[in-house]
């Protein structure tokens, strides 16, 4: 009997007991199971039988798994698989090489493609024989060329759309205000204002301007003052208003309204820039006007009926705008 490990004398006997008992106990399954359960209280009968049955199977599996590895390790590798990548990348499908056509072949195929983009089977066979490729390669070439043609056509359409949009926008902007007139300075030819001159931008006449306009119209109908009527006609024909009848603001406003019909815009604007000083200094003051009216009344015999007065002559004089008064224009009679 083999001796156990060198331990304390008291522990040596206890350590040798299981060895002697295990050698003397008969190989009875039931008794052996009870003995194992006594040694290991956590063991159950089912687990013990399973462990006993699984031991030979494990040994067989280990031998089978170790056998091929040992043999494969001894087998030499073939020259076919030397210097080649192994693993998942080796399972990729081999990519077919692309067919390269010469210039003569491409010209021939393009000529037939311009005639018909979808050739029939007979035409495909003829092209394959003339070019020297298979029918499948001819079909692939026509398919790729059709896709290329569609892309080029779509790109040309997209490039043409912005040009048409810009041209239509420019036409709409130019025709949006057909009656607009650009204002240009007559001296240097530069534009005086960037906006357009339409109906909404024409200034309206005030009360004094309307009354003076009615006075001119009355003279035109009655033919009673030839000099002023002649000046009024010259104003309509040439776009120049009498200096004695208007101030700077009135001439500019009325002239801007009539220039659209009878005169050019630069003439009216140039006159409006030159007229203020002459028009402001030409009119008499308020005291002079009242003095003249009183003198006319004193010289008349019957100032209520005004029967002995000569043919009335209507004139318009501009009063000083800085002094407050109710009437801006006064029509008076002169003997």
From Swiss-Prot:
User: Which Pfam families does this one have?
Assistant: Homeodomain (PF00046)
The UniProt entry, under CDD domains, shows: homeodomain (cd00086)
Q: In which tissues is it expressed?
A: Specifically expressed in early embryos.
Cellular component, GO annotation: nucleus
Instruction: Briefly explain the null phenotype.
Output: No visible phenotype; mice are viable and fertile. Female mice lacking maternally transcribed Obox1, Obox2, Obox5, Obox7 as well as zygotically expressed Obox3 and Obox4 are infertile: embryos arrest at two-four cell stage due to impaired zygotic genome activation (ZGA).
Disulfide bonds, paired cysteine numbers:
none
This molecule's function is given as: Transcription factor required for zygotic genome activation (ZGA), a critical event in early embryonic development during which the developmental control passes from maternally provided mRNAs to the expression of the zygotic genome after fertilization. Together with other Obox family members, required in early two-cell stage embryos to kick-start the major ZGA wave by facilitating RNA Polymerase II 'pre-configuration', during which RNA Polymerase II relocates from the initial one-cell stage binding targets to ZGA gene promoters and distal enhancers.
Protein name (Swiss-Prot/TrEMBL): Oocyte-specific homeobox protein 3
The record lists the organism as Mus musculus
Q: Which gene encodes it?
A: Obox3
